[in-house]
């Protein structure tokens, strides 16, 4: 079976709360790091989430 091109990543909150989301991304279409605005339930507002490596 062929290995998939999608890689698992972690989106970590820039608010410093320690909250994170996990998702996948296609490395061929998006080689740069992602920066997405999502809801942080700890801070109770929308903040930027930066891509980090999933350990």
Swiss-Prot record:
Signal peptide: none annotated. The keyword NADP does not apply. It comes from the Bacteria. Keywords: Ribonucleoprotein, Ribosomal protein. One of its GO terms (cellular component) is cytosolic large ribosomal subunit. The keyword Ribosomal protein applies. GO terms for molecular function: structural constituent of ribosome. It holds the Pfam family Ribosomal_L33. GO terms for biological process: translation. Belongs to the bacterial ribosomal protein bL33 family. This is Large ribosomal subunit protein bL33. It comes from Bordetella avium (strain 197N). The lineage of its organism: Bacteria, Pseudomonadati, Pseudomonadota, Betaproteobacteria, Burkholderiales.
């Amino acid at each position: 079976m062929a290995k998939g091109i999608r890689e698992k990543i972690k989106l970590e909150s820039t608010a410093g709360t320690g909250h994170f989301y996990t998702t996948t991304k296609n490395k061929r279409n998006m080689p740069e790091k992602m920066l997405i605005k999502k809801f942080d339930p700890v801070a109770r507002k929308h903040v930027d989430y930066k891509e980090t490596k999933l350990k």
